[in-house]
Protein backbone atom coordinates (compact mmCIF):
# COMPACT_ATOMS: atom_id res chain seq x y z
CA UNK A 1 0.00 0.00 0.00
CA UNK A 2 1.06 3.56 -0.64
CA UNK A 3 2.15 5.53 2.44
CA UNK A 4 4.84 8.20 2.84
CA UNK A 5 8.16 7.07 4.33
CA UNK A 6 8.68 10.25 6.36
CA UNK A 7 6.49 13.26 7.07
CA UNK A 8 7.47 16.57 8.59
CA UNK A 9 4.28 16.84 10.65
CA UNK A 10 2.34 13.81 11.86
CA UNK A 11 -1.05 15.58 11.91
CA UNK A 12 -2.28 18.05 9.28
CA UNK A 13 -5.33 20.17 8.63
CA UNK A 14 -8.01 18.71 6.39
CA UNK A 15 -7.44 19.70 2.75
CA UNK A 16 -10.04 21.76 0.89
CA UNK A 17 -12.21 19.84 -1.56
CA UNK A 18 -13.56 22.84 -3.48
CA UNK A 19 -12.46 23.92 -6.95
CA UNK A 20 -11.24 22.12 -10.03
CA UNK A 21 -7.97 20.25 -10.50
CA UNK A 22 -5.13 22.56 -11.57
CA UNK A 23 -3.10 19.92 -13.38
CA UNK A 24 -3.15 16.29 -14.45
CA UNK A 25 -6.40 16.63 -16.36
CA UNK A 26 -5.31 14.86 -19.56
CA UNK A 27 -4.12 11.34 -20.27
CA UNK A 28 -0.33 11.65 -20.34
CA UNK A 29 1.19 8.15 -20.24
CA UNK A 30 -1.29 5.48 -21.33
CA UNK A 31 -4.11 5.29 -23.88
CA UNK A 32 -7.08 5.36 -21.48
CA UNK A 33 -7.67 6.90 -18.06
CA UNK A 34 -10.12 7.32 -15.17
CA UNK A 35 -11.09 10.97 -14.63
CA UNK A 36 -12.79 12.23 -11.45
CA UNK A 37 -16.06 14.13 -11.89
CA UNK A 38 -16.69 14.95 -8.20
CA UNK A 39 -14.29 15.83 -5.35
CA UNK A 40 -13.32 13.16 -2.82
CA UNK A 41 -10.69 11.91 -0.41
CA UNK A 42 -9.25 8.66 -1.81
CA UNK A 43 -7.55 6.42 0.76
CA UNK A 44 -4.50 4.27 0.13
CA UNK A 45 -6.67 1.14 0.45
CA UNK A 46 -9.05 2.35 -2.26
CA UNK A 47 -6.13 3.11 -4.60
CA UNK A 48 -4.70 -0.37 -4.03
CA UNK A 49 -8.11 -2.02 -4.51
CA UNK A 50 -8.63 -0.21 -7.84
CA UNK A 51 -5.12 -1.16 -9.00
CA UNK A 52 -5.71 -4.85 -8.20
CA UNK A 53 -9.10 -4.82 -9.99
CA UNK A 54 -7.45 -3.40 -13.13
CA UNK A 55 -4.38 -5.62 -13.21
CA UNK A 56 -6.34 -8.80 -12.58
CA UNK A 57 -8.69 -8.06 -15.46
CA UNK A 58 -6.00 -7.26 -18.04
CA UNK A 59 -3.74 -10.14 -16.89
CA UNK A 60 -0.62 -9.60 -19.08
CA UNK A 61 0.37 -7.30 -21.90
CA UNK A 62 -0.76 -3.98 -20.45
CA UNK A 63 0.70 -1.24 -18.27
CA UNK A 64 -0.92 0.71 -15.43
CA UNK A 65 0.03 4.17 -14.13
CA UNK A 66 -1.21 5.62 -10.81
CA UNK A 67 -1.20 9.43 -10.92
CA UNK A 68 -2.34 10.17 -7.35
CA UNK A 69 -0.48 9.58 -4.09
CA UNK A 70 -1.94 9.48 -0.56
CA UNK A 71 0.31 12.00 1.19
CA UNK A 72 -2.13 13.54 3.71
CA UNK A 73 -2.97 11.94 7.08
CA UNK A 74 -6.57 11.89 8.32
CA UNK A 75 -7.03 11.55 12.07
CA UNK A 76 -9.73 9.86 14.13
CA UNK A 77 -10.52 9.88 17.83
CA UNK A 78 -11.27 6.55 19.55
CA UNK A 79 -14.88 5.39 19.91
CA UNK A 80 -16.82 6.60 22.98
CA UNK A 81 -14.30 9.34 23.75
CA UNK A 82 -15.41 12.72 25.06
CA UNK A 83 -14.67 15.81 23.02
CA UNK A 84 -11.51 17.75 23.73
CA UNK A 85 -8.12 16.49 24.95
CA UNK A 86 -6.40 17.01 21.63
CA UNK A 87 -6.60 15.79 18.09
CA UNK A 88 -6.98 12.07 17.37
CA UNK A 89 -4.25 9.80 16.06
CA UNK A 90 -3.61 9.40 12.30
CA UNK A 91 -5.90 6.68 10.96
CA UNK A 92 -5.72 6.86 7.13
CA UNK A 93 -3.57 8.31 4.39
CA UNK A 94 -5.56 10.13 1.73
CA UNK A 95 -5.11 11.78 -1.64
CA UNK A 96 -7.23 14.90 -2.13
CA UNK A 97 -8.77 14.44 -5.60
CA UNK A 98 -10.56 17.33 -7.29
CA UNK A 99 -12.83 17.17 -10.36
CA UNK A 100 -11.01 16.80 -13.66
CA UNK A 101 -8.05 14.84 -12.26
CA UNK A 102 -6.93 11.73 -14.21
CA UNK A 103 -6.16 9.26 -11.41
CA UNK A 104 -5.28 6.04 -13.25
CA UNK A 105 -3.99 5.43 -16.75
CA UNK A 106 -3.89 2.21 -18.71
CA UNK A 107 -2.21 1.08 -21.91
CA UNK A 108 -3.63 -2.08 -23.49
CA UNK A 109 -4.01 -3.21 -27.14
CA UNK A 110 -7.70 -4.26 -26.88
CA UNK A 111 -10.04 -1.31 -26.23
CA UNK A 112 -12.97 -3.40 -24.97
CA UNK A 113 -10.89 -5.16 -22.30
CA UNK A 114 -9.19 -1.88 -21.32
CA UNK A 115 -12.52 -0.10 -20.81
CA UNK A 116 -13.90 -3.01 -18.75
CA UNK A 117 -10.78 -2.98 -16.54
CA UNK A 118 -11.13 0.77 -15.94
CA UNK A 119 -14.85 0.39 -15.18
CA UNK A 120 -14.05 -2.24 -12.54
CA UNK A 121 -11.45 0.07 -10.99
CA UNK A 122 -13.87 3.04 -11.03
CA UNK A 123 -16.39 1.02 -8.98
CA UNK A 124 -13.83 0.83 -6.16
CA UNK A 125 -13.46 4.62 -5.93
CA UNK A 126 -15.62 6.92 -3.75
CA UNK A 127 -16.60 9.41 -6.46
CA UNK A 128 -18.24 9.66 -9.86
CA UNK A 129 -15.74 8.93 -12.62
CA UNK A 130 -15.60 8.69 -16.38
CA UNK A 131 -13.28 6.86 -18.74
CA UNK A 132 -11.29 9.16 -21.02
CA UNK A 133 -9.15 8.37 -24.02
CA UNK A 134 -5.97 10.05 -25.22
CA UNK A 135 -6.66 12.60 -27.95
CA UNK A 136 -5.16 12.01 -31.40
CA UNK A 137 -3.01 15.18 -31.25
CA UNK A 138 -1.53 14.50 -27.78
CA UNK A 139 1.95 13.03 -27.56
From Swiss-Prot:
Signal peptide coordinates: none
Transmembrane segment boundaries: none
Biased composition (Basic residues): 1-19
Gene Ontology biological-process entries: translation
Alphabetized GO MF terms: rRNA binding; structural constituent of ribosome; tRNA binding
Chain segments carrying region Disordered: 1-25
Keywords: Ribonucleoprotein, Ribosomal protein, RNA-binding, rRNA-binding, tRNA-binding
One GO cellular component term noted in the UniProt record for this chain: cytosolic large ribosomal subunit
Superkingdom of origin: Bacteria
NCBIfam families per UniProt: rplP_bact
Subunit composition and interactions: Part of the 50S ribosomal subunit.
Protein family according to the UniProt entry: Belongs to the universal ribosomal protein uL16 family.
Purpose of the protein: Binds 23S rRNA and is also seen to make contacts with the A and possibly P site tRNAs.
HAMAP family xrefs: Ribosomal_uL16
Designated name of the protein: Large ribosomal subunit protein uL16
Organism: Streptomyces griseus subsp. griseus (strain JCM 4626 / CBS 651.72 / NBRC 13350 / KCC S-0626 / ISP 5235)
Lineage, opening ranks: Bacteria, Bacillati, Actinomycetota, Actinomycetes, Kitasatosporales
Amino acid sequence: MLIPRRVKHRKQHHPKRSGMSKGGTQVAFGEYGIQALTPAYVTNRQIESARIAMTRHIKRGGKVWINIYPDRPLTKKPAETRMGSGKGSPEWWIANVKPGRVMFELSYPNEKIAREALTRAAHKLPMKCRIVRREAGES
